[in-house]
Amino acid sequence: MKKLLCAVLLSPLLYSNAVLADDAKQLRETLNGTESLKADFKQTVTDINKKVIQTGAGVFALAHPNQFYWHLTAPDESQIVADGKDLWIYNPFAEEVVIMDFAEAINASPIALLVHRDDATWSQYSVAKKQDCYEIKPKATDAGISSVNVCFNKGTLNKFNVLDDKGNQSQFDLSNQHSISAADKALFKFVLPENVDVDDQRLKSQ
């Protein structure tokens, strides 16, 4: 998730620009109704042959604007926290924390649309509706992801999947969805653990 990949352009024979624009508008309107969300997730990763190569579980949360929380609890623990300015990636096993500029880290992925509302970010992606799901594809050729599908049930995000350029697909099924509470807001504030190595990549880009 640290670096997400690729761009596959939609065929003009299948979708007109007007239809794509309308689908993007519908997705934006749906997301505008979700100022915050917290949920449990189960992750299933399959390869190009649809063989399961990994499963996992954890907790996921987001809040507008630009706040994100991801805590993988199994099989190996890891944590990603974005406070709107910085993004922190914590690997307890390696005792390492990587700090990145939020905009650079998130904007490379269609997942950015879940927390961004600005026109500039949305203009970087094509959106096509397929029943209760929306397929999002980056227009750039070096984005790091082929596509993301986000699906809703009665306006509530209930699953999404990420497809990379090697054909690997990560499916995330959500449960126990609810708006974040006042106490949950602490999730978006990363507390640096003691005795960990820190790789501050924000300094490298300055």
Curated annotation (Swiss-Prot):
Q: What is its main location?
A: periplasm
GO BP of this protein: lipoprotein localization to outer membrane; lipoprotein transport
Keyword terms: Chaperone, Periplasm, Protein transport, Signal, Transport
The answer to whether the entry has keyword Ligase is: no
Q: Where is the signal peptide?
A: 1-21
Gene Ontology CC annotations of this record: outer membrane-bounded periplasmic space
User: What Pfam families does this protein's entry cite?
Assistant: LolA
Q: Where in the cell is it found?
A: Periplasm
Q: Which domain of life is it from?
A: Bacteria
Keyword Glycoprotein listed: no
Q: What family is it from? A: Belongs to the LolA family.
Assembly and partners are described as:
Monomer.
Q: What job does this protein perform?
A: Participates in the translocation of lipoproteins from the inner membrane to the outer membrane. Only forms a complex with a lipoprotein if the residue after the N-terminal Cys is not an aspartate (The Asp acts as a targeting signal to indicate that the lipoprotein should stay in the inner membrane).
Q: What is this protein called?
A: Outer-membrane lipoprotein carrier protein
